[in-house]
Structures are given as structure tokens and as C-alpha cells.
Amino acid sequence: MGGDATTIIFSDQVMENGSLLKYNGDSFFEGSLVEPLSCVVGAFNAQYHMKKMYSYEHVMGIKEGGAIALLGATGPMGFLAIDFAIHGPKKPKTLVVTGRTQKKIDMAARLYTVEEAKKNGVKLVYVNTRDIVDVNKELRKYSEKGFDDVFIFAPNEEMVTYGVKMLAFDGCLNFFSGPADQEFSSRVNFYNIHYNSTHFVGTSGGNTEDMKQSIELIESKTVNVAKIATHILGLDHAVETTKVLPELEGSKKIVYTHKKFPLTEVDKFDENSDDKYIRELKSIVERNGNLWSGEAERYFIQNAPEI
């Protein structure tokens, strides 16, 4: 609801279904990222495993202290999944993140460091799978028994195929990335389904409870969604930016619908600008680790020209 609108009308269903949620976060832009975070939270919540061997009673969520593989997780949703795996209520012992573009992997490694993961009891490994012939064999070096939870972040048949092979006993594969092709399919090993209790989950967005959990995670700064806010812009540049969105690098673009401002990378403000407020904005961003922040947003709203 909202999009590029400057004002909106809530439908009666929103109120009747209890879907108007209270948000007391530090900034508007973090609130705008509740929905994408809820998709990740929902995916993690949808995972399930046996309570004990041969039990038909399931424990919902990722396997605590287990091994997780996030395949193709070098986009904004993958970044949120890394953050949530490290800082969420249930943590794995081992977290392997893959991608095929080294630049994106390097960005992930800067934002979500091995050291930060270690502080939270998680062994974090980044792997570029571009030139790896047998991905299953290579990634099992980090979890010999296989992976308890595997998340697929790209609708790629090959990735699904080796992702299925990576599952441990009672392993759960989540097909997170929605395909455009209605006939998208991949080979499935039914031997492992029968004898090793492997299973599959597909989630498409989060529900109201996932949204509530996401709000709490953002308000408490447990998950730092600012790490995926790479650009800001005003409403005057929203149309053109939307048209070329697939061609743009970076993650989420934050539109301030009452402001006039060109599409700008958060860490690329010009310190030599003639506008004093641009120079001050750069200073604020640098103080916050080159990330957009509540402080930067408040200064921007106060000083950027109105549409």
C-alpha cells in the first residue's frame, strides 16, 4: 500500500483484519523495509524439522545449532537473510552464503562480517560458485553431513538441483525466489524424501505475524535494514528510476515522496557541493558507517527542497 503516493486511503479490510500495525522505529525508511524483511522472517519461520528422530511432531523454524546454506544470496533479500540468520532468535552453527559475482560477495562480506557472525556463535563462510563444477561436494566441506536448511534465492534449475543434493537427514529446502515461468521445475530425489526425510517449503511473502516480528527486529536494531538502503531519491525522479531499475546496481532505493532530489547513492554525496546541506548530509552518512540512518533522514527531510 502506498508506493509513490503522497497520500493514501486505507480500505476497510485493513482495519477489520487487524493489519494496521503500530511502528515506533527511528526512521520512516526503516519502516518502509518492514515488508521485505517479513518475507525473510516468514521463510525462516516456515522451515520445519522433526522434534526427535522418527517423530511426526515438527518443530517450526530453522534448526537451531544446525547448518544453513543461502544459495544465490547476494541481493537485498539475501542480505537480510544473512543478517537474520546471524542475529535472529534461532541461530545456526554454520552459515554458508553463495553467489556468482565476486563484487556482490565482497559487499556482503563487508556488511556482514565473519567476525560479527563469530560473536554470535555462527561460523560464516562466503563462497563464489561461478567456477565450481560440483557445488554440492564443495559446500559439504563446511558441513559434511549436509545442510539442515537450504534457501534458494534465484529461480535457477541447476541451483535447485544441487541444493536438493545438499540436504542432510530431515533437511528442509525453501524455494524463496518466485519464478516467472509457471512451468519452472527441477529434478527431485525421491529416495532421499523417502529414506532421509528431506522436505520442501515455498513461501511467498510474510503474513501479519511475520510483519509484527519484523517491526520488533527493526525497532530493537536487532536487524540493520539500513545496510540494504543504497540509494535515495525524490518523487520527481521516481518514474525514470523505476523504468531503469533492473539496470541499476545496489539494493533498495528509498523514495521520499514529498521531496525533489536526484537518484543518489548513499555513500556518494559530494563533499565539494555548493549546497551546505549536501556537505552536512555526507558528514552524517560517514558518521553512521556510510549508511543511511534516522539522523540522515531527519536532516534530509528538514533541508531537501519540497516537490
Predicted features and spans:
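Hydrophobic/small residue at the entry helix of a nucleotide-binding pocket
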Residues: C39, P76-M77
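Adenosine-nucleotide cofactor-binding segment
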Residues: E64-G65, L71, I82-M159
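Residues in the short beta-alpha loop(s) of Rossmann-like NAD(P)-binding domains
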Residues: G99-K103, P179, K259
